[in-house]
Amino acid sequence: MEIKKIHQDFSVCKVMDYSLVNLNAEYSFIGKTDEEKSLVCVTSDVPPNVIQRDDGWKGFRVQGILDFSLIGILSKIAEILAKNSISIFVISTYNTDYVLIKKENYQKALDILE
């Protein structure tokens, strides 16, 4: 498994609506349920209509396209980091998984996973 560091800082947000979200930004993950509208984006791209936000996240992605039949990649990462008391925030796309970690634990997490 190869991981690729993402150099930008991320924010996890709750937004009123998506009207001010820049969907052309390099990273923009949105999630909508019956209870909330969420956005994860580069901190400098956070729109002004946020209700709540949590800054200070760094991330990496599992490099390459992950076939849906692959089992256990994300659980292995989560297990290794949990054993070292590092919490994660995960976003999955069609191709791969993105793992966000608070800045203060980011380098430690990378060192552990190498």
Task: List PLM regions with ranges.
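C-terminal structural segments of small proteins and small subunits
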Residues: 87-94, 101
